[in-house]
Amino acid sequence: MTSSGKIRIYELSRDLNLENKDVLNAAKKLSIPAKSHSSSISNAEANEIKAFLNKQSNQSINNKTKQNSSKEILSLKKAGSKPIKDEITKKKANLPPKASAESQSSKPRIETSKAPVAPIKPIKEPVQKANTSNQSKGVINNLIQPQKPSPLQPKQPKSIHLENNASKQNIEDNNNFQERSPRTQLVQKPPLPTKNNEPPQQKTSIPKRPITPPARPSKPILDNRSSVKSRPIIEAPRKKTGPDRNSPVQPRTQNNQNRQRIPNKPGKPPLRGNPPVELVGAPIRRSNKPNNNVKGPRDGGYRPGPPNRNDPSNQQGHVKRDIKAPIRQRPGMPPGMRKPVAPGELMQLQKPTGRSQPPAPRRVGAPAPPSQRADSTKDRQGKSPGAKQPVNRPTPATAPKKPSHRPPGSGPTKRRSDWDDAAKLEALRNKAPQKQRQKVHIIGENDDALTTETSGFAAEQEAMVLSASLARPAKPKSTKKSNSKATVVTRKRKKESTRQRQRRRAMELRAAREAKQVRPEMIIIPEGNLTVQELADKLSVESSEIIKSLFFKGITATVTQSLDLSTIETVAEEFGVPVLQDDIEEAATKTAEMLDEADKDHLIRRPPVVTVMGHVDHGKTSLLDAIRKARVASGEAGGITQHIGAYQVELEHEKKKRKLTFLDTPGHEAFTAMRARGTKVTDVAVLVVAADDGVRPQTLEAISHARAAKVPIVVAINKIDKEGASPDRVKQELSEQELVAEEWGGEVVMVPVSAIKGENIDKLLEMVLLVTEVEDLQANPDRLAKGTVIEAHLDKAKGPVATLLIQNGTLKSGDVLAAGPVLGKVRAMVDENGIRLKEAGPSCPVEALGFNEVPTAGDEFEVYPDEKSARAVVGDRASDARATRLAQQMASRRVSLSSMSGQANEGDLKELNIILKADVQGSIEAILGSLEQLPKDEVQVRVLLSAPGEVTETDVDLAAASGAVIVGFNTSMASGAKKAADANSVDVRDYEVIYKLLEDIQLAMEGLLEPDMVEESLGEAEVRAIFSIGKSAVAGCYITNGKLQRNCKVRVKRGSQIVFEGDLDSLRRNKDVVKDVGSGFECGVGCDRFANWKEGDIIQGYKLVTKRRTLGP
């Protein structure tokens, strides 16, 4: 008996003088969980087992006394007993070794088969108490009727295939379990088919031989015969497999009808002899194999018994699967083991972690620590911007502050009182260089007289004498006299040292600079690099501050050292000033003059080109909608413009029809190059500023573009109808950018408008026309066309399509033109409304077809008289463009050798390969520019291919070969590309808004990062007792909060000291192994690598969980 009041199985078997297996068999019949002879059961369960075994022994005694009660039945059974014995003797040769444990009493079962089975009395106790003898006789008669061989014998291949011998025996075990079941339905249903004079199991296949497998032990059959004998109706269905079915023993077929579904073992022909009744009794075989006889009269209402509940193959799904596909599985293999695994998305794919916790990245460019150190350095050196008062007016008090900076001749001028001789003074002057560091610490009473006697040199050096005296502790009255004369002497000082003069001038210059210091809103970086001094001048800071900032970032620099663009951006960001590249600025500058000398005689007035610019969501497209009386903004993805839209609007001004060409540019920060191209070809820039938002970063960028293009600016203050709108505040912010309104005395036209309500739209257009009249815009329509490519894309039906803005001349269908390195012949032209044109004049935007490839947006085009001359120009440009493109690709992939090798050694060098396809060239530029801004310290983004057009099968093949992701922007997939992508498992993503595209790419880059391991606290326990077990020890603990889990991480603290960190290997409660113990309970804790427990120790339990890392700092 255990300490908790339970009884072991072997103790119970010893008390009952039985074998352990007999007690285990009884426990299993009673659904009492007992795995082995050492399992513990409660007293109530032990009493239940004892009662069951006593009842079983009584039944066997009663059955033996009734052996000779019915000679008629006995004579019938004798006829079938001999074949059974022969059968068993044949089977004994195939017995498995493990059958020996249960083969003690098989012989009595064969003998009891000769006993009469007809009496119904034993059935009442285990199966149903309500059955009468009349019902049982009816059952017997009904079961005896079907005498003929089963017509369903050819359907044997569709029957259930047992998995192994043990599973066949398990079917009989289930019958033994059902013998003690109180369900009446299991006994009453089989007689129902007798109404139609049909066999009880017409749908089941009836084997021609006994169903016992060849490996079934014979002794277990004898062991349980006494119990089977008292239940003849439940265990008799196997009798029906032979032709001798007239025997009155047929009532035993009541509950074992499912056994008729079991087929012969594959590969062995069925035996056609008379299978007797004696082999139907199930051996008491405890096994975990599935019970497959769940069909027949118990379909739908049967529940598997507790002994086989934990086996996954004991479910109805398992039986149905075997019926549909009679595939013999391996023993113990659960059905459905091979599950289809959905392929994970490539964009969210993570590499397997190679270590528990990756090292944290070292961020060199973090701006916070350098700023803190810079501030502390400013305090030490006294160079803070506020320290300008002691600089402008140097006073006599400044001289004593620097006694160390003395001229070489200042030392010997300190004369002692005994030096009255002029000759001694002269000798002292001659020896001054050798005795420069001579101690002159005695100041006598005759200093005043000496000062009056000496002239020139002594007067000039008096200030340094006084500074030395003031640097010492207070002196007698003579020092005070000297101090009083010091003021007079310093006022009379005629000249200062070179070092003092330089310092004074530097301090004055710094003070003056700090007095008028204003940080610029934005700095423009030229294409070449900047030196430290040039950057300091642009940022209006000292060069020492930039050197200091670079030093804290691990970069040693001098004032003449050149800095690359990334370093300049980092430093400028630290000082709060955005950086604009000069190449973007140059893109906005008008490079070519469209008018030639020959055009001056044929010039006419042309429509002005107006570019609408401004920050994102400030209402540019809505303003154009109000002008064109169209609804463009509502149809755009995300409500933002992502292309340059070119429109021509006809207005009535001063009773004349006037045309205006509008270019709508994107306001998103990614479309800087598009805005620059729009400014390059424009005549007037309309700057849209929201009255409720004010001047924003893209507003400043648009202003710089317009100034680079040298075009006039008209400001439209939009959204004046919204709450919180303040046009005056917008004018104030624009005045800080040197855009002063006319009503404030400036030259910039500012018009408050409301695009939604249409307020002041006519006034804005009138102002635009007035400004363009001053510009005197002219062009020559009688010449070959010249202009600029505004946008370009690849259409799957039309091929390469370019949006052209003709700036001079007339473009006609059939013209041969060269746009950068691309050759084209105009096959067709359409305007913004889709109307086909034969020719287009100056300032007219058209879409042209007929290019051999997609031209680059921003390139200038020119029409040539013949194709030969055009090809010559294009060939030279193509070679230059190839070299430039190759240089850009190499620069984008450039990684420092040291960082690359270090990352490769640590396995941290990760790459995300992308194939980018978009609708137009401008979108490609914008996305590539945005990808350059993503952090690339740990994950590199490699763009293998970027081109406008739809996704083709070639792109899919390239992605499959390189493991890349195809990213499409406002594009579609060609025919066959989708099928190829599915076949090669290539991830193809399509986006309509650039926000979402960049966000997903950043998430994919983060997915390649190894996750961080973070501690998650579980609970705490206090050690209250220690139990020694051999060489180790177990701590008896009380859970104070949370819980402790087995195999979790623990930290043992003794006071403030941590004495152990490791795994919790053993966790028990009341000598039972448990998975976890909650707060308020006691438990035993054991660690394999720690045994030095002490009372009062605190055990902290925690576990390590993974946390997704981000690219940000």
Curated annotation (Swiss-Prot):
Keyword Lyase part of the UniProt annotation: no
UniProt GO MF annotations: GTP binding; GTPase activity; translation initiation factor activity
Stretch list, region G1: 614-621
Biased segments, Basic residues type: 474-483, 490-504
Polar residues compositional bias, start-end: 56-72, 129-139, 162-187, 194-205
Family affiliation: Belongs to the TRAFAC class translation factor GTPase superfamily. Classic translation factor GTPase family. IF-2 subfamily.
Name this protein carries in UniProt: Translation initiation factor IF-2
